Each structure stands twice: as C-alpha cells, then as structure tokens.
C-alpha cells in the first residue's frame, strides 16, 4: 500500500524587450506574459495478492488485484478524481493475463494558458499558387480558456514465457490499448488549406 500527498507551486514569466513589444523588429513581434498555479494532490495505491505461492489452487498460479485513486485540486480550474483498477491472472507459471482501466487527466501548461500573442512571418506553401513559398503574417498565443485534457484508458494483454535453456529468456506477448481522449491540448501550426 502506498499513500501520499503532494503540493506544487508553479509560475511562469516571459518579459519581452521594448522593441519586440512595440513590434519594431522586422518579421517578428513579441509580448510579455506571466501566470501561476498551485496544486495539491492526495493519492493511495493498493496491490492485493489474492492467490500466490502460499495459497495456490489448481488452475490459478497467481491472482492479483490493483486499485489506485488520485485527487487533485488546482488554483486555476476545477478538481479531478482519477481512479485506476487492474487485475493480473496467471493460470500457470509461464502464462499471464492482465487488464487495467484508468481515468487520466492532464492540466494545460502555463505556457499554453498564458503565452502572450506574438507575430511572425513563416514561409508557407500555397497550393493555389503552384506551391509557391510565400511569407504570411501569423499571430499565435496562449489561451486562458483551455480546459484540462482527460482520458479513459483500457489495456489488456497476455504474455507467455517460452521454455528456454538456462540463462536465456524469451517472453512473447500481445497487448491491446484503447485511449479515449477529450479536449486534447495541442498547438496548431501555420498552414494554408
């Protein structure tokens, strides 16, 4: 069993020079930005060896359960609960089946939230002009309205330890993973459609 508490204070600050701030540098412009966040978390994880070496029964070499929970509180948006449940079952010493379900959460970075607007002139290829490279004025910046990225994850698999000569190991396995992401956080690059 593991139990823990975590506390984090984070801040970010990027102060632009006066020429960049006034858009006086050709081909570039800048801005200043800053942001901060405090976060606390509590977590517990429990591994339960249901059947093992001391209480083995026919058809079950080992059986184990796992349960975990994490609760986080953020100063700049809501709280989050993230559970995890897993099972491992080995009918023999060499064959193992496993499965896990987990809710996951990723907060927006301070950079993605608070980055100031900047202007640049990247070279883009315009398909309407025969893929000719041209410079276009683009503006980019943070978004203080971003929501956290959340996901539901399921994994399952089976592995088999192949009998081999002494000091040589070979394990074969097959796994299945499914990740359902919501509100995925990503930067959009400059492009022409």
Predicted region positions:
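Residues on the lipid-exposed face of transmembrane beta-strands in outer-membrane beta-barrel proteins
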Residues: 1, 42-48, 85-89, 99, ...
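Short loop/turn motifs that connect adjacent beta-strands in outer-membrane beta-barrel proteins
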Residues: 1, 51-63, 94, 163-170
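Transmembrane beta-strands of outer-membrane beta-barrel pores
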Residues: 5-13, 50, 69-75, 101-107, ...
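Outer-membrane beta-barrel translocator domains and adjoining extracellular loop/strand segments
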Residues: 13-20, 57-59, 77-83, 111-115, ...
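Extracellular loop and loop/strand-boundary signature of outer-membrane beta-barrel proteins
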Residues: 26-34, 68-73, 141-144
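Residues that define the transmembrane beta-barrel architecture of outer-membrane proteins
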Residues: 36-42, 79-83, 140, 150-154
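Outer-membrane beta-barrel signature, preferentially recognizing the C-terminal barrel domain
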Residues: 108-173
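Outer membrane beta-barrel strand-and-loop segments of large Gram-negative receptors
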Residues: 147, 173-193
């Amino acid at each position: 069993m593991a139990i823990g508490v975590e506390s984090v204070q984070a801040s970010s600050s990027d102060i632009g020079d006066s020429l960049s701030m006034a858009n006086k540098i050709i081909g570039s412009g800048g801005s200043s930005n800053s942001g901060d966040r405090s976060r606390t978390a509590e977590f517990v994880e429990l591994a339960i060896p249901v059947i093992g070496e001391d209480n083995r029964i026919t058809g079950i070499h080992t059986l184990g359960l796992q349960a975990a929970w994490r609760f986080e509180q953020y100063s700049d948006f809501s709280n989050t609960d993230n559970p995890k449940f897993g099972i491992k079952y080995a009918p023999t010493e060499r064959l193992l089946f496993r499965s896990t379900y987990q809710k996951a959460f990723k907060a927006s970075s301070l950079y993605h939230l608070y980055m100031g607007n900047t202007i640049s002139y990247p070279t883009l290829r315009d398909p309407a002009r025969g893929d000719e490279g041209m410079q276009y004025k683009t503006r980019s910046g943070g978004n203080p309205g971003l929501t956290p990225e959340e996901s539901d994850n399921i994994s399952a698999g089976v592995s088999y330890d192949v009998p081999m000569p002494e000091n040589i190991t070979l394990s074969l396995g097959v796994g299945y993973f499914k990740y359902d992401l919501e509100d995925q956080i990503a930067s959009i690059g400059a492009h022409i459609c």
